[in-house]
């Protein structure tokens, strides 16, 4: 029997994992500047955590969730997105309390799961980096989160970005617009896709997000939510636009954008790239927005929030397509060459000692001859080789070679063990 990874998953091998670590560390560095701290939540949650928060008519709930009943007959799902689990933790741990500084800022990283048709940049197990900020109903925080998302993508050298912004308004806005949209769509009901027919009276805003070509034609002339904003919703959106202008962030308004999850209101946004990874077609890499009601749905007090999620696989596809050389290094400082069985123990002690001094060190474990060991040192791009044979062992010395220019010096083992750093310059200069 041939065992293979499940469809829609990927093995991240050591040659690739360094890129992932680089992306994650860059994100952590930026989030720290914005005062966001990491939260780690379970990979699986109760089914209701997502069915209540994502919306009963969303594709995630109706088509894409990996859910099952465990041995205790509990309905469990693998998390399809990061926000709901963070909100559940926020409520369960009473982080809404007055003793916790607001806004409460947190970020997460990890795998998510959706049963979708696998394609480039969209797998069934995929990875997200996301942020959430709770407890402040202020458009300024919406803009800060958007600015942070732009900063993050630009930190990877991505400058050809398209920021699309919309507002879903407040509850009154959505109720008024909902009815207007139903009135517009009902004459076209027979022409709508099956999914859109089902959503027409349950959640007509989701029809705007349909991928069906006929649906797209129909909604092209649909009324705009921007014409139904209440005074408060209009003020919120105008402030967002003004602050984006103040920060010099270019954006376009897309009044048909609704996002794939039902919990958003007020500001929503998507950041797209036209990288050659997507054949020059604008493709969403990062998206998010403002939400109210989500904390209450999971048992907490009324608490607004704002956040975004970024697809790591898509970001890496862009970086690969742009052929950017990522500053990823796992340098080998010293390769210790042992000649003869009698040097086995001292070679092991030397590599351990060098590691304890803060250097990266390695040695041969296959009993290869010196020629083979030097080949390994070359393949591993070792900066130095430290060679010890039976004669050197008797004299408590070793041969230190700077691989870049071939300079060699004889060094005392005691000096290697006590202060290898002082020997580096001597070897480089050949003194």
Curated annotation (Swiss-Prot):
The keyword Cytoplasm applies. The keyword Nuclease does not apply. It comes from the Bacteria. PROSITE patterns: AA_TRNA_LIGASE_II. CDD domains: HisRS-like_core, HisRS_anticodon. It is found in: Cytoplasm. Disulfide bonds: none annotated. GO terms for molecular function: ATP binding; catalytic activity, acting on a protein; histidine-tRNA ligase activity; transferase activity. Pfam families: HGTP_anticodon, tRNA-synt_His. Its EC number is 6.1.1.21. InterPro entries: aa-tRNA-synth_II (IPR006195), aa-tRNA-synth_II/BPL/LPL (IPR045864), Anticodon-bd (IPR004154), Anticodon-bd_dom_sf (IPR036621), His-tRNA-ligase (IPR015807), HisRS-like_core (IPR041715), HisRS/HisZ (IPR004516), HisRS_anticodon (IPR033656). GO terms for cellular component: cytoplasm. Keywords: Aminoacyl-tRNA synthetase, ATP-binding, Cytoplasm, Ligase, Nucleotide-binding, Protein biosynthesis. It catalyses: tRNA(His) + L-histidine + ATP = L-histidyl-tRNA(His) + AMP + diphosphate + H(+). HAMAP family: His_tRNA_synth. Belongs to the class-II aminoacyl-tRNA synthetase family. This is Histidine--tRNA ligase. It comes from Ligilactobacillus salivarius (strain UCC118) (Lactobacillus salivarius).
